[in-house]
């Protein structure tokens, strides 16, 4: 397997403007994400795809490989698909730029289905939620996923799925961890498709795959980490970094 990690990064964010350049213990957030990606054992290359000269400059100051992409990408997967057209690889992993604490073991876990004889169209990670995690289950910023018996995604939603008529304890909920591995062919096919109805309704780009008949293999991980979507998330990550540094 010849796998390349592509990190899409844009400057504008409705919930947390310029979050990619937010300071995390002296480094931009996007640099932290790039450094974690370099620790993967399965990937041979890490590239950041951006349309922002400001983000590119911040990364290049640390020696990161950057590809400039069109400002017209409608989502991160379209952005990495553009970059992937000039890279020779079998598999591309889309790592969100706002994951500065991503564990490299999760990156490798997401890529492992592509080591099998019959690889999926796409793979991603899910983290099991407990009944006491009801705040996450109800939080629209936390994406939930329901699986079939073979571990393939049936649906992703910002709503609590599956709906419970009685109590949350009656079923298993999973939180989606937003990194994806694609075959090179499926990635380009994805980018050629228009945004789908459910994708636009939920604002979840992975639904474009499901609506068009592609499978998404979901691998369960026990290694959790917070992404950065809101100011509260950013404060949490800063506190975690201070604790890990003994401050």
From Swiss-Prot:
Principal subcellular localization: cytoplasm
Alphabetical list of InterPro entries matching this protein: Cytidylyl_trans, KdsB, Nucleotide-diphossugar_trans
Top-level EC class as recorded in UniProt: transferase
GO annotation, cellular component aspect: cytosol
Pfam families (alphabetical): CTP_transf_3 (PF02348)
Keyword Transferase recorded: yes
Alphabetical list of SUPFAM superfamilies matching this protein: Nucleotide-diphospho-sugar transferases
Swiss-Prot/TrEMBL catalytic activity: 3-deoxy-alpha-D-manno-oct-2-ulosonate + CTP = CMP-3-deoxy-beta-D-manno-octulosonate + diphosphate
EC number(s) recorded for this UniProt protein: 2.7.7.38
Record-level Gene Ontology MF annotations: 3-deoxy-manno-octulosonate cytidylyltransferase activity
Compartment list: Cytoplasm
One annotated GO biological process: lipopolysaccharide biosynthetic process
Function: Activates KDO (a required 8-carbon sugar) for incorporation into bacterial lipopolysaccharide in Gram-negative bacteria.
HAMAP family on file: KdsB (MF_00057)
Family label: Belongs to the KdsB family.
Designated name of the protein: 3-deoxy-manno-octulosonate cytidylyltransferase
Organism: Chlorobium limicola (strain DSM 245 / NBRC 103803 / 6330)
